[in-house]
Amino acid sequence: MKAMVMERAGEPLRAAELPVPKPRPRQILIKVAACGVCRTDLHVFDGELQHPKLPLVLGHEIVGHIEALGEDVEGFAVGERVGVPWLGFTDGTCFYCRAGRENLCDHPLFTGYQIDGGYAQYTVADARYVFPIPEGYSDAEAAPLLCAGLIGYRSLKMTGNVPVGAPSRLGIYGFGAAAHIVAQVARHEARQIYAFTRAGDAKAQEFARELGAVWVGSSDEMPPDPLDAAIIFAPVGSLVPAALRAVRKAGVVVCGGIHMSDIPSFPYEILWEERVVRSVANLTRDDAREFLALAPKVPVKTTVVPMPLASANEALQRLRQGELTGAAVLIP
C-alpha cells in the first residue's frame, strides 16, 4: 500500500510502499478514503510531542470502509463506513478507565502517534475506537469531525452549561478547523460567538463572520462585552491571561489543544472571583457517539481542502503557515 512515512521528527515525510496490515483479534482493517490533517500531526512532526513510534504513519482523522474484521469483533460489517479518532487504545483497567474517564487512561495509545494512522491506503484500529460515520457527509467532509470536531465538542462541553435568561458569550481564540465546527454547535445552543485571530488575518476573520460571529478581532484585543467562557485553540500560552481578562466573574477558559507554548505569569487578580482555567485531554467514546449523532442535526458543515496523499508535506506546511480556510484532507 502507499503511505507517507515519518522517519524522524522535522524531516519531510517519505512516500513508501508498505505491506497492508492484518487485523489482530478485536481489530478492524480499514481501507482509508480520507484523512484530515490536524495541528496535532504538526506537533508530532515537529517533535513537540516526543517519543512517537518510528517509523510512523501520521493521521488520526480517518474515514474509510471496513475491509476485514479480526477475531472477536462484533457490531460491524465489511463495507461499512467508519471513522477512527486520536484515542486509539485504553487499558480498560486503570483507575481512570474504571471511573469512566478513559480519556485520562494511564496506558493509552494514540492513532498517528503510537499507532500507525491514516496517511496511507489502509490502517488497522481497535474496534472499541471505531465509530460509524453519519450520512450526509462525503468522506472528505466527515474527516474533520474525528478530531477537530470531537476535541472541539469536548472543549465546548467543558465551558459549562449555557446561562438561563441572558445571552451566553463564547470567545474562540484561533479560528481554524476546530473553531469552525465549534462555532456551529455553539450557535445551535444559542451562544454568541466572539472570534479572535492573528492580527491582520483578514481571511480567518471573514471566515468567522460567515459562520455567524457577532464580533471579530485580533487576539490582543479585548472584546466589547465580557465573555462567559473562552476556548483557546491556538497553541499560544500568552492567550491564557488574555482570555482570563476577557471573561466575566466565574468565567471558564478552556485550553483545547494537546500542546501549548509556556503560559507567562499573570496577576492573581485576573484569576480571582472564581474564574477557572482548564485543559482538555483526548476524548471518550461517549463524546464520539454524542457528537457524531449531533453533527447532522445542527447541521455541522465542514470546510475542507482535499489534497492527494502524496501532498502530505505540503498540507502540513500550509497548516503551519495558517494558509488553510477549514481543514486539509488527504485522499489516498
Where are the model-predicted features located?
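NAD(P)H dinucleotide-binding glycine-rich loop of Rossmann-like/cofactor-binding domains
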Residues: 90-173
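Glycine-rich cofactor phosphate-binding loops and adjacent beta1-alpha1 units
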Residues: 161-170, 194, 202-276
